[in-house]
Structure formats: C-alpha cells, structure tokens
Regions:
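N-terminal strand-loop-strand
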Residues: 1-41, 69
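Short, solvent-exposed loop/helix junctions and linker helices
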Residues: 9, 47-51, 126
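Short hydrophobic/aromatic beta-strand or adjacent loop that forms the aromatic wall/cage
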Residues: 10-14, 87-92, 111
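Active-site-adjacent beta-strand/loop module that shapes the phosphate/pyrophosphate-binding cleft
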Residues: 19-21, 78-104, 115, 119-121, ...
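Nudix hydrolase/Nudix homology domain
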Residues: 33, 37, 86, 107-147
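The catalytic Nudix box helix
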Residues: 42-75
Length: 147
C-alpha cells in the first residue's frame, strides 16, 4: 500500500477520522500569520524526514490529539495537490475513530478546540477549510453515493 511507502514524494497529510456520522475536527488558532486562521480543519500536517504518508498522519494525530492510530483504521486515501506548496502533493486519508479514542483525547498545543462535528455540518460550514471539505466530499461521493 502506497500509504506505507516512505519513498513516496509528498509534503504532508490530513486525515478525516470518522466516528459514526461525525468527523473529528480542530479549530485552528486565531493568528493572522497562519493559513486559515480560526477555521475548522482536520488533523494532520507536514512530513518530517522520510516518513510514509501513514507515519506522517499517525505522528500528527498523536501530537495534536494524543490518539494512537493503527494502519487497520484506514478506509481510503488519495493524493491531491498540496494546499500550501504549488507543484507539490499531499495525501488525504479517511480513517475510523472509535468512541473510546475520542473519550481519551489529550489536546495538544496547536489549535483552540476540537470536536466531533456532524459530517454534514463540516461540509456546509463557512468556517471550515474549503479544500478539506472538498476532499471529504470526494470520499463520500466515491463510497456512499452509489444510487
């Protein structure tokens, strides 16, 4: 699986952690010097060293929320253009989050708050990072809109 391949060239990862009909979101810091200040986003961040996409996502989720992810939680992934670096790519993943993982979150020092938000609310919010809304929508359309 390419998510485990550290030779893949990518800038960073974001992961939508889904628990029932909700997604785990983080309210970004309200600082003018960061992209998308005071907006709801998904866990993740920049690659360190030669991490694989999964290693990058797992490290970021642990740093931001104290959650240990295992590879078996992954449901989907897709490579997209980087949100920050033109001409580079990033990886978007979707994984399952168990209620007990949410209940045991240890919130890190990035962001103002976290919450399990209804997926529909995240997709419609004017206060959510638009690129992440689109990427989550891609997953849902590919996996659930099979009418």
């Amino acid at each position: 699986m390419e998510l485990l391949d550290s030779r893949m060239d990518f800038q960073g990862c974001k992961i939508a952690l889904i628990c029932g009909d909700k997604v785990l979101t983080i309210l970004r810091d309200d600082k003018e010097n960061i992209p998308w200040p005071n907006m709801w986003e998904l866990p993740g961040g920049g690659r360190e060293g030669d991490e694989s996409p999964f290693e990058c996502a797992a490290r970021e989720v642990y740093e931001e929320l104290g959650i240990h992810l295992t590879e078996d939680c992954l449901l989907w992934s897709k490579v997209y253009p980087s949100m920050l670096y033109e001409g580079r790519q990033s990886v978007f993943m979707v994984g399952q989050l168990r209620h007990e993982q949410f209940d045991n979150i240890t919130f890190g020092d990035e962001g103002q708050a976290y919450k399990l938000m209804l997926i529909e609310e995240f997709l419609k919010s004017k206060q959510a990072v638009p690129q992440l809304q689109g990427r989550l929508r891609d997953y849902l359309e590919e996996n659930y809109d099979k009418t």
